[in-house]
Design a protein with these regions (language model features):
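Short, surface-exposed loop or secondary-structure junction motifs
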Residues: 2, 6-163
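Short linear motifs in intrinsically disordered/low-complexity regions
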Residues: 65-67, 179-182
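Short, well-ordered beta-strand elements
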Residues: 175, 182-188
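Short, surface-exposed charged micro-motifs
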Residues: 142, 174-176
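Hydrophobic beta-strand positions
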Residues: 21, 176-177
Length: 188
């Protein structure tokens, strides 16, 4: 009997599990691995989890008023409830950054996995992350894409080229790459 799936549902469970897998394979906490392999060598000075450990509260923009779980304005702590239950350290959410740092990561993706002459990801990995992978979803492996069937649906402008990819955050942030026009857009 063949199963027929007609719709997809966005879920962050896969990224929570991916974070756990990274820890198992790296033999260290995900945060330490990311710091060693990406943040430090890429010069991402303001990127990481639990920013109150490194920065004054006054340097961190309040992200949201949590009326459900913590019942306070969140500043320096993840808004996503699932990540909050993991102490703010999960593969799906909780990463704080600046527009400059996010732009460097997206520029690295636009460059096919390298920046400043240093390779961080293979071209094939970048292609896999940013190419639509399903007929029932407009997503790549982690990135949103324009909806080819109905350009007015989704998070991209209707005139966006099909090659565009990006991601929106839980608190209204977004970052996009337009490979055709060699543009990186970040709004935090």
């Amino acid at each position: 009997r063949q199963m027929c799936i007609r719709d997809s549902v966005y879920s962050d469970v896969g990224f929570i599990l991916l974070g756990m897998l990274v820890e198992q394979l790296a033999g260290m906490p995900m945060e330490a691995y990311l710091q060693r392999e990406f943040y430090e060598p890429m010069g991402l000075e303001h990127t990481g989890y639990l920013p109150l450990r490194r920065f004054a509260k006054s340097e961190i923009v309040p992200s949201n008023k949590d009326r459900f779980l913590r019942k306070e304005t969140l500043q320096g702590f993840v808004h996503d409830e699932a990540s909050a239950f993991f102490g703010g350290l999960a593969g799906n959410a909780g990463l704080f950054s600046t527009a400059r740092d996010v732009a460097r990561v997206y520029q690295m993706l636009l460059n096919g996995g390298e920046i400043d002459g240093q390779r961080y990801l293979s071209k094939e990995t970048c292609q896999l992350f940013t190419t639509e992978t399903s007929k029932i979803s407009r997503r790549g492996l982690g990135f949103d894409k324009p909806d080819a069937d109905d350009p007015k649906k989704g998070n991209c402008a209707p005139a966006a080229p099909a090659e565009v990819y990006g991601h929106t955050g839980f608190t209204g942030t977004c970052a996009w790459v337009d490979p055709m026009n060699e543009l990186v857009y970040v709004c935090l």
